UniProtKB/Swiss-Prot annotation:
The keyword Chaperone appears for this protein: no
Family of the protein in this entry: Belongs to the UFM1 family.
Subcellular location, principal: nucleus
Signal peptide: none
Crosslink position(s): Glycyl lysine isopeptide (Lys-Gly) (interchain with G-Cter in UFM1): 69
Prodomain residues: 84-85
SUPFAM superfamilies (UniProt xref): Ubiquitin-like
Encoding gene per record: UFM1
Superkingdom of origin organism: Eukaryota
Positions bearing the Glycyl lysine isopeptide (Gly-Lys) (interchain with K-? in acceptor proteins) cross-link: 83
Pfam family, one: Ufm1
Function: Ubiquitin-like modifier which can be covalently attached via an isopeptide bond to lysine residues of substrate proteins as a monomer or a lysine-linked polymer. The so-called ufmylation, requires the UFM1-activating E1 enzyme UBA5, the UFM1-conjugating E2 enzyme UFC1, and the UFM1-ligase E3 enzyme UFL1. Ufmylation is involved in various processes, such as ribosome recycling, response to DNA damage, transcription or reticulophagy (also called ER-phagy) induced in response to endoplasmic reticulum stress.
Protein name according to UniProt: Ubiquitin-fold modifier 1
Keywords linked to the UniProt accession: Cytoplasm, Isopeptide bond, Nucleus, Ubl conjugation, Ubl conjugation pathway
Species of the source: Columba livia (Rock dove)
Length: 85
């Protein structure tokens, strides 16, 4: 099985740190989201991954599908601050 590579940028940090992750294309994208969140030390349960265009990605698909639909450049958003007042 071939691998796909994602560059995931943490948008909540002003320095915009990023991690490059390579995973088998059959990997559930929920696992990619969880691993990326753990790498940035943010809670996976309240995080989302979006494209650079701001389009949300449904994690209920394989990493290969996400790569084909959205490419390799993604952003991780911790949702704990979204919508709070």
């Amino acid at each position: 099985m071939s691998k796909v590579t994602f560059k995931v940028t943490l948008t909540s940090d002003p320095r915009l740190p990023y991690k490059v992750l390579s995973v088998p294309e059959g990997t559930p994208f929920t696992a990619v989201l969880k691993f990326a969140a753990e790498e940035f030390k943010v809670p996976a349960a309240t995080s989302a991954i979006i494209t650079n265009d701001g389009i949300g990605i449904n994690p209920a698909q394989t990493a290969g599908n996400v790569f084909l639909k959205h490419g390799s450049d993604l952003r991780l958003i911790p949702r704990d601050r979204v919508g709070s007042s």
